[in-house]
Amino acid sequence: MSALNLTVRVHPVVLFQVVDAFERRNADSHRVIGTLLGSVDKGVVEVTNCFCVPHKEHDDQVEAELSYALDMYDLNRKVNSNESVVGWWATGNDVTNHSSVIHEYYARECNNPVHLTVDTSLQGGRMGLRAYVCIQLGVPGGKSGCMFTPIPVELTSYEPETFGLKLLQKTVGVSPAHRPKTVPPMLDLAQISEASTKLQSLLDLILKYVDDVIAHKVTPDNAVGRQLLDLIHSVPHMTHEQFTQMFNANVRNLLLVITLSQLIKTQLQLNEKLTFLPAA
C-alpha cells in the first residue's frame, strides 16, 4: 500500500506525553522529538504510545541518544508487545531542515514511518496536529531527495480514555485557585442521570434539525440523513411494556451492584480499622 493512502489515528495519551516532554525540556531546547509506538492495520496507523528521545540540533547535524531510544523501546516491548515503532513526533508547527535526517533513522526502524508534529505554542487557541509521510523524489542516475507530504490525521480514544477525558473537562473553566487537584469518579446513578440529560439534549438538537429541514430553513445534508437513518434502524423494535420491563430489570441489577460494592467497601474499611487496633 502506498504511504500516501495511510491514515493516522492518535490517542489522547500520546498528546499528554508530548506536552509533558515539552514542559520538561532543557532550557536551551527549542524542539522536542520522540518515537511513536502503535500498530498498522489496513492502511490505518494507530498511535497508542510514545516516548521522548533526547537530542541536540546544530546547524549541520543532529545528535540523538539512539541507545536511550533503543532501551526505552525494549522496556516498552516487555510491557506491551503489540506496540511497535510506527514513526516519530516533534513539537512545532512546521517541518524543519533536520526532519529529513531524523526521518532517515526511523525509516530503518519501520516501513513507511509517519511524522507527527504537535504545535505546543497553541497558535489560534488550539493544539495543531499534523501528520506527514516522506516521499522519495529524483530521477534515475541523478540527485535524489525527499518531500514531506501531509496525510489525514484524526483523534481517537478507547472507552476508558473517553471517560478520563470527561473527568478532566470538569476542571475546564475553573480558576486555578479553586481548581481541585483530583476529580473523583461519579457515582453510577449520577453517571446515568448525566448521560440521560446529555442524550435528551442531543435528541432535542436532532429534532430541531429535522424540523428546520422540513420547514426549508436549513439545506438538507445527505450524509446527516443517512446517519439518522442508520441510527433509527439500530434502535431495537419493542413495545412500551417490553421497554419498561427491560429498563426496570437493568435498574434493579445496577442497584444490586451498587449495594454489594458499598458493602465490600464498608467491610474493607472496618477490617482496616480492626487491623490497627492494639492487642488487648
Curated annotation (Swiss-Prot):
Keywords in alphabetical order: Cytoplasm, Initiation factor, Protein biosynthesis
A Pfam family annotated for this UniProt entry: JAB
Gene3D superfamilies recorded: Cytidine Deaminase, domain 2
Keyword Plastid: no
Classification via InterPro entries: eIF3f (IPR027531), EIF3F/CSN6-like_C (IPR024969), JAMM/MPN+_dom (IPR000555), MPN (IPR037518)
Chief location bin: cytoplasm
GO MF term (any one): translation initiation factor binding
UniProt subcellular location: Cytoplasm
Domain (MPN): residue spans on this chain: 8-138
SMART domains referenced in this protein's UniProt entry, alphabetically: JAB_MPN
GO BP terms, alphabetized: antibacterial innate immune response; defense response to Gram-negative bacterium; formation of cytoplasmic translation initiation complex; positive regulation of Notch signaling pathway; positive regulation of peptidoglycan recognition protein signaling pathway
GO (cellular component) term, any one: eukaryotic translation initiation factor 3 complex, eIF3m
Record carries keyword Cytoplasm: yes
Family indicated by similarity: Belongs to the eIF-3 subunit F family.
Cited PANTHER family: EUKARYOTIC TRANSLATION INITIATION FACTOR 3 SUBUNIT F, EUKARYOTIC TRANSLATION INITIATION FACTOR 3 SUBUNIT F-RELATED
Quaternary structure, from the entry: Component of the eukaryotic translation initiation factor 3 (eIF-3) complex. The eIF-3 complex interacts with pix.
The protein's role, per its UniProt record: Component of the eukaryotic translation initiation factor 3 (eIF-3) complex, which is involved in protein synthesis of a specialized repertoire of mRNAs and, together with other initiation factors, stimulates binding of mRNA and methionyl-tRNAi to the 40S ribosome. The eIF-3 complex specifically targets and initiates translation of a subset of mRNAs involved in cell proliferation.
UniProt-recorded name of the protein: Eukaryotic translation initiation factor 3 subunit F-1
Source organism (scientific name): Drosophila yakuba (Fruit fly)
Name of the coding gene: eIF3f1
